[in-house]
Amino acid sequence: MKKVFIRTFGCQMNEYDSDKMLAVLAEEHGGIEQVTQADEADIILFNTCSVREKAQEKVFSDLGRVRPLKEKNPGLIIGVAGCVASQEGENIIKRAPYVDVVFGPQTLHRLPKMIVDKETSGLSQVDISFPEIEKFDHLPPARVEGGAAFVSIMEGCSKYCSFCVVPYTRGEEFSRPLNDVLTEIANLAQQGVKEINLLGQNVNAYCGEMDDGEICDFATLLRIVHEIPGIERMRFTTSHPREFTDSIIECYRDLPKLVSHLHLPIQSGSDRVLSAMKRGYTALEYKSIIRKLRAIRPDLCLSSDFIVGFPGETEREFEQTLKLVKDIAFDLSFVFIYSPRPGTPAANLHDDTPHEEKVRRLEALNEVIEAETARINQTMIGTVQRCLVEGISKKDPDQLQARTANNRVVNFTGTPNMINQMIDLEITEAYTFSLRGKVVEA
């Protein structure tokens, strides 16, 4: 049985793709063994992220560490997948000639054939084309062991924000046909999955073709998935404010399975910076979306992405972001220092903000967000939360870990038969990034 080591960098889309790589290899070889140490593997895969320079360079650092394994075992297969593969292509082979296969997010289904071609010809294989929907036509049926699962409904992005490489590494937006998505979710529900997370670079742009040739938009998809037997909770990742329509907002009013947590990246509270980023909305328009959402879901927890130190960002513009964060009360958000990416329009902008100042802004923004997260956690003490038990706690092997609808991790004492089940937990303690609870007896 082939032993496979895979290291995944970046977003949840990459996590999903890594699972699919393992699935196509398992189908090809009649099963595989996933190992946690590279020196135990027959196949080593790095599924990469190019959103920030640091993540991209780490890939080449990791490749350097496995080079001695290749020298010791020439039959070892080393592969680079994901967005760095799409961006760099043949350059990866030039920089690391011991790499055997390089493939992008849309060609991962071709991995088994690429390995065979490498073994037959002795030549490294590179395939970073964008065949769009073909990938999903060649992936084996989803198999899961947990109570939650990701389902990719669309890929790519056509927004072309000035700082972002995604349209260049994952291609333009394309949506899976409605029936394909529903079949996958129904299959997962039959396997015991309770929670579905609909996945895409911009899920609100979903426009899947229906059997009658009509187009299903994202709000309609949410309503259909809501009625699939066995599915108890629904999430989606990630959205773009420009297409967060009233019909999507109304789903929060009508669909109780849709969790009270939303990740909606804003990036900045400054209209000038948002315009330079080519985001296509203003801070006021973003706040209008949130106002409508909280009018119908007052308990909605909102997380976001922020970039500090974007070229030309002034102290006043950063203060506008800080004020927006306080006004909206963002929770569990992600703050990054701007990282110029080759080939993007923003990479050509003049940047005169010292790195030390960018670090200060990052820390200031994180401080405000973490304070709000801690405040929300404190308000949950004494409440009973419906939670999905994910498995053994990462903090204590004698405890279990569950997740609330608003995306909080709860550690508690339980029994193994609770894993992958929905249970009620009373929250007894709150920390900055997790909660402690106890089982509510029926």
UniProtKB/Swiss-Prot annotation:
Subcellular location: Cytoplasm
Gene expressing this chain: miaB
Class of this enzyme: transferase
Molecular function in Gene Ontology: 4 iron, 4 sulfur cluster binding; metal ion binding; N6-isopentenyladenosine methylthiotransferase activity
Extent of the signal sequence: none
Protein name: tRNA-2-methylthio-N(6)-dimethylallyladenosine synthase
Subunit structure: Monomer.
Keyword check for Acetylation: no
Residue ranges of domain Radical SAM core in the record: 143-375
Cofactor annotation comment: Binds 2 [4Fe-4S] clusters. One cluster is coordinated with 3 cysteines and an exchangeable S-adenosyl-L-methionine.
EC number from the UniProt entry: 2.8.4.3
This protein's record includes keyword Magnesium: no
Gene3D superfamilies in alphabetical order: Methylthiotransferase, N-terminal domain, tm_1862 like domain
Binding site for [4Fe-4S] cluster 2: C157, C161, C164
Keywords: 4Fe-4S, Cytoplasm, Iron, Iron-sulfur, Metal-binding, S-adenosyl-L-methionine, Transferase, tRNA processing
CDD domains per UniProt: Radical_SAM (cd01335)
Catalysis performed (reactions): N(6)-dimethylallyladenosine(37) in tRNA + (sulfur carrier)-SH + AH2 + 2 S-adenosyl-L-methionine = 2-methylsulfanyl-N(6)-dimethylallyladenosine(37) in tRNA + (sulfur carrier)-H + 5'-deoxyadenosine + L-methionine + A + S-adenosyl-L-homocysteine + 2 H(+)
Domain TRAM: 378-441
SUPFAM superfamilies: Radical SAM enzymes
Pfam families with a match to the protein in the record: Radical_SAM (PF04055), TRAM (PF01938), UPF0004 (PF00919)
